[in-house]
């Protein structure tokens, strides 16, 4: 039997699993800024064993024949600070090329089990080489080799060809204790101008708080669902 997509729905409400908090998202929760609350929600998602609680959908702008088109994919947030969220990738990938042309993006964290999501939007800039190097050294060796082997987002003839590229890179760095950072690889920092916290509620009357960030100044307003 085919799935009835129109009938699929979840009745939000009550205390989110593992949160131990009132479900009613309150402006007071943002007294310390947007970053502590986002960090807290990621930690709560971790506590209830959500897979990759730091995953976020990154949306960029692809300019095709002079026309802007949306593009999105899931990446992992690898850094969180009052300045913004950090992620790493191949600078020559589709998203890297798009960010070079239009250095602005949106990122959305979604935790359905908790009935929560957070949406950030703002300009994007590359992280420093020093910051990239620190994170690179924390990556598993297999991931480092993969970053050298893959020309991300470009066509390849077969899986076998990709495996051969990995074998060549593995041989190249055999005996090398610290694999260097590829010149085409590094981090990005998304500096949010807006951060929206969303909490599901019964009857689809969800809680939405929008944080606007302008330098040291922050304002919070409640949005209708």
UniProtKB/Swiss-Prot annotation:
Annotated protein name in UniProt: Pyridoxine/pyridoxamine 5'-phosphate oxidase
Family, similarity comment: Belongs to the pyridoxamine 5'-phosphate oxidase family.
Q: Does the keyword rRNA-binding apply?
A: no
Q: What lineage does the source organism belong to?
A: Bacteria, Bacillati, Actinomycetota, Actinomycetes, Mycobacteriales
Q: What class of enzyme is it?
A: oxidoreductase
Q: In which pathway does it act?
A: Cofactor metabolism; pyridoxal 5'-phosphate salvage; pyridoxal 5'-phosphate from pyridoxamine 5'-phosphate: step 1/1; Cofactor metabolism; pyridoxal 5'-phosphate salvage; pyridoxal 5'-phosphate from pyridoxine 5'-phosphate: step 1/1
Please give the organism: Nocardia farcinica (strain IFM 10152)
- Database matches in HAMAP family: PdxH (MF_01629)
The entry marks the following residues as binding substrate, namely 9-12, 78, 135, 139, 143, 204-206
Subunit and interaction comment? Homodimer.
- The protein's gene is named pdxH
């Amino acid at each position: 039997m085919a799935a009835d997509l129109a009938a699929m729905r979840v009745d939000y409400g009550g205390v989110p699993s593992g949160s131990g908090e009132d479900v009613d998202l309150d402006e007071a929760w943002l007294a310390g800024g947007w970053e502590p609350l986002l960090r807290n929600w990621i930690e709560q998602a971790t506590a209830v064993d959500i897979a990759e609680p730091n995953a976020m959908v990154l949306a960029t702008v692809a300019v095709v024949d002079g026309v802007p088109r949306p593009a999105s994919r899931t990446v992992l947030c690898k850094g969180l600070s009052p300045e913004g969220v950090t992620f790493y990738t191949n600078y020559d990938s589709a998203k890297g090329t798009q960010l070079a042309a239009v250095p602005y993006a949106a990122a959305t964290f979604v935790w359905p089990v908790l009935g929560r999501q957070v949406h950030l939007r703002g300009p994007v800039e590359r992280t420093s080489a020093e910051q990239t190097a620190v994170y690179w050294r924390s990556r598993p060796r297999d991931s480092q080799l993969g970053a050298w082997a893959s020309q991300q987002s470009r066509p390849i003839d077969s899986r076998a060809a990709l495996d051969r590229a990995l074998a060549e890179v593995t041989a190249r760095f055999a005996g090398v204790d610290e694999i260097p950072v590829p010149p085409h690889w590094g981090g990005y920092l998304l500096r949010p101008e807006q951060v929206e916290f969303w909490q599901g509620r019964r009857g689809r009357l969800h809680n939405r708080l929008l944080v606007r960030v302008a330098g040291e100044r922050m304002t919070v307003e409640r949005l209708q669902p």
